[in-house]
Amino acid sequence: MPETSLYGCVRACHRARSILWIALAALSPVAATAVHAQSAAFPAKPIRVIVPFTPGGFTDLMTRAVGEPLAKNVAQPVLIDNRPGANGIIGAELLSRANPDGYTIGMVIAGHSASQTLYEKLPYHAVKSFQPISLVGVAPLILVASNSFPAKDLKELLAVARAKPGSISFASSGVGAAAHLTMELLAQQQGLTMTHVPYKGTAPALADLMGGHIQIMFDTMSAMLPQVRAGKIRAIGLSSESRWSAAQEIPTLAEAGLPGFISGSWAGLLAPGGTPRSVVDRLSGEIQKIVRQPEVRARIIDMGAEPVGNRPEEFRVFMESEVARWAKVINQAMLRLEQ
């Protein structure tokens, strides 16, 4: 799989920064002064961050990791507003309808881009209805197996799947989640037939994996690595381009036999469409500074993610590529959901 979405896109976006700054330098002194004045006046009151999932999960923790230092930097409270439901759609719709003044923003994850194709009647457009602020971090997924599953590595797993089509059941935290779609991507690329068993969250899926009721699954490093190190499940490989700094003993799927296989989840901040550019730039600039802080970087890495922090244009390109990428996987798998 080409790396044009996720990590490859992130690197390409960083290279585009120098071109963008040249364009910004062409602004007239008057225009530049006006933009600075508007952004300097923001914020004058608390900022609300909509999190479309429950407290304590990956999205919530990522939001708090940057929300706390953001409040300090802008000298205004940053209020976390958890609005879970419908795979993140309830919170995202609320964000899309919010006043576009910068005082309501939201954190979304990879499933946000997949929803554009997964749902036939989405009440917003995953990209066009929003103003991207910054990609906060990307999180590789780890492919794990039950200890009772006979395959000890990727080569053996693929051999079992090909020898007995349909014999392997894989779990996910829900239909359309990054973990589900990454397994669909693997199956499509390798011509495999496997049975998907969706759960309502990672915890019950992991419990059945450890109990031997399910053979394999993808999920985040933060959720799976403790169980791997405790010997309760077996690591097969990571969906990143290089080994994870905190788990060098686990190979990537690319080096294990799937060249170019890169996938995962991510978390990024959006504002409602129509939010003034000066306000978006102010927020984006703060987030970029925040994710470079050593303590914030360490906090994000502890969650199994890689800090990014990029500009609005870069995040928009990234989101567009993610929508297109997952549309192909979803359409080939003939997946559709109703809200």
Spans of features found by a protein language model:
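Sec/Tat signal peptide C-region and signal peptidase I cleavage site
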Residues: 31-37
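Hinge/capping helix and adjacent helix->loop/strand transition within the periplasmic-binding protein
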Residues: 97-103, 117-204, 253, 266-299
